[in-house]
Amino acid sequence: MRRLFDADVAVAEVDPREVDPEHVLLPVERDAVARAIDTRRLQYAAGRHCARSAMRTLAVPPGPVTQDDDRAPRFPPGLVGTITHTQWWCAAAVALESTRAALGVDVE
């Protein structure tokens, strides 16, 4: 996915099966998927893991990625981003809001 974006966009990818939601999710994120099935919880955790990894690449403090009422990811203030996944792959792209108005990728 890296090749889809310019250098000012940080990208991270992971196999959701390699992520432990209990160790990755922040409390506010954990609450959002407390009643979700395991597959959804894994994909949600993998997306947040990738998003925070991308934030670190941008040298910004990694924060929670909550969700809007339509389940779209809501990034911390000053950041824009996107999260996408399949059953076996998850990725996030994050940029500073000062350089991008929005980002979007959907693989399915």
How should these model regions be labeled?
Residues 1-108:
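Core catalytic alpha/beta fold that binds nucleotide/phospho-ligands
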